[in-house]
């Protein structure tokens, strides 16, 4: 199945052709980034999303900002809230390397003890 999607109003370094949405969706769908999308994924860094009316709008935010469901059909965000099937909580840290998080680095106790580190905790 082919999905036509577009990304607008993301941070300046966001790559619309190589990102976590493309990585996830391309496992099941044939993805085409298009100026005439069926699905628009947008964020908080602009107002270009207001120019799109004939597509499904999905709001994505990694910050603690509550989605306005008058402006979007679905939302993916940080807030701990429920809005039926229209909202999915996806904290920003989930997008980090899962393998690296699942297999923490093993720390050698000898290395920790022999690093000549000193710390003070002061309270008045």
Question: Where do the model's predicted regions map?
Answer:
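N-terminal pre-catalytic "stem/leader" segment of glycosyltransferase-like enzymes
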Residues: 1-53, 68
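Catalytic core of nucleotide-activated saccharide and alditol-phosphate transferases
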Residues: 36-124
């Amino acid at each position: 199945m082919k999905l036509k999607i577009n990304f607008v109003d993301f941070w300046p370094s966001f790559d619309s052709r190589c990102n976590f949405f493309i990585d996830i969706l391309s496992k099941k769908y044939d993805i085409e980034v298009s100026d005439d999308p069926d699905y628009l994924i947008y964020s908080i860094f602009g107002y270009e999303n207001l120019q799109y009316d004939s597509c499904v709008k999905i709001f994505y935010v990694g910050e603690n900002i509550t989605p306005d469901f008058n402006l979007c059909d679905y939302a993916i965000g940080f807030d701990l809230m429920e809005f039926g099937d229209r909202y999915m909580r996806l904290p920003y840290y989930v997008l980090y390397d899962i393998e690296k998080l699942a297999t923490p680095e093993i720390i050698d106790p000898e290395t920790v003890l022999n690093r000549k580190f000193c710390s003070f905790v002061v309270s008045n």
